[in-house]
Amino acid sequence: MRFANTLRRGAVLSVALALLTCVTACGKTAAQKQREEAVALTSLGEKYVKEKVRDPASAQFRNQFIGKGGAPCGEVNAKDAFGAYIGFQRYISVARELTLLAQDVAPADFEESWRELCR
């Protein structure tokens, strides 16, 4: 009898967890899931860009969007070694090791990457 009660409680708990999971995950529309994914990718892109600028705490972002294949693209402005903002420049962040700032590569190379990944 004791085993049956334990088994019954376990089954009830399993059903409750399954319902809760379905309510939280299944209740979202495709658009909501897409927005959440875009926010997560944008945040990750900001993190990787901040690792590349001289003063990460000063980084300001604008015109951000998710490009082709899920690459976060946008513009960043940050302070240089003298404490002055350098002006907004475009960035592409495919991964930590594949984050490009416009100032770090030849203009023609950056433009080609921007066309392929961001437009």
What are the language-model segments listed below?
Residues 26-119:
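Cystatin/cathelin-like cysteine-protease inhibitor module
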Residues 1-24:
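Sec-dependent bacterial lipoprotein signal peptides
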